[in-house]
A protein has these predicted regions:
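Acidic, PIN/NYN-like endoribonuclease modules and their adjacent C-terminal/linker elements
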Residues: 1, 107, 111-140
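Short, well-structured N-terminal submotif of metal-dependent ribonuclease cores
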Residues: 1-39, 47-65, 139-140
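Active-site phosphate/pyrophosphate-handling residues
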Residues: 7, 20, 83, 105, ...
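Alpha-helix capping/helix-boundary segments
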Residues: 8, 39, 81, 106, ...
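Nucleotide phosphate-binding site architecture
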Residues: 9-10, 41-44, 126, 133
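Short, structured coil segments at secondary-structure junctions
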Residues: 29, 70, 128-129
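Active-site neighborhoods of divalent-metal-dependent phosphate/nucleic-acid chemistry enzymes
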Residues: 45-53, 69-118
Length: 140
């Protein structure tokens, strides 16, 4: 199981995604790729804060298309993930490497499901015990 981080999903929404990222995603088995409710929220928030207009409408449509491809493969931030979140955040705090925002929620979902995380921001997930795949540097 591989979870796509927000930056990977956002890249797939671009009119011309980075060729390496697109090739990497296409090389995976569709059933192995997941994303999270956190990523869905981040992407939708980014779209909804835009002024009304053509760009916002286009991005809504693109997001519907991309997330529609996941249907049953959007993992929730549930009670078990919340417990892992507490462990991740407190562990990083003790190590002097605080982690904030949505990243620890995504990391906790990955840990709960024993999933790797495809992301461009590998350093953001250091010391979370999540296997990280940098889709911008992977060669296919």
């Amino acid at each position: 199981m591989i979870v796509l981080d927000t930056n990977v999903v956002a890249e797939l929404m671009r009119p011309a995604p980075a060729p390496g990222v697109l090739a990497w995603v296409r090389a995976q088995t569709t059933g192995d790729l997941y994303t999270t409710a956190i990523t869905l929220a981040e992407v939708r928030y980014g779209i909804e804060r835009l002024p009304d207009g053509r760009r916002k409408t286009l991005l809504r449509s693109t997001a519907d298309e991309v997330f529609g491809g996941f249907e049953e493969q959007i993992l929730p931030f549930d009670a078990r993930a919340a417990l892992r979140y507490a462990t991740i955040v407190s562990g990083r705090d003790r190590a002097g490497r605080p982690i904030e925002g949505f990243d620890p929620q995504i990391a906790s979902i990955c840990r709960e499901h024993q999933a790797a995380l495809a992301t461009r921001n590998a350093t953001d997930f250091e010391h979370t015990e999540v296997e990280v795949i940098d889709t911008w540097s992977v060669t296919n």
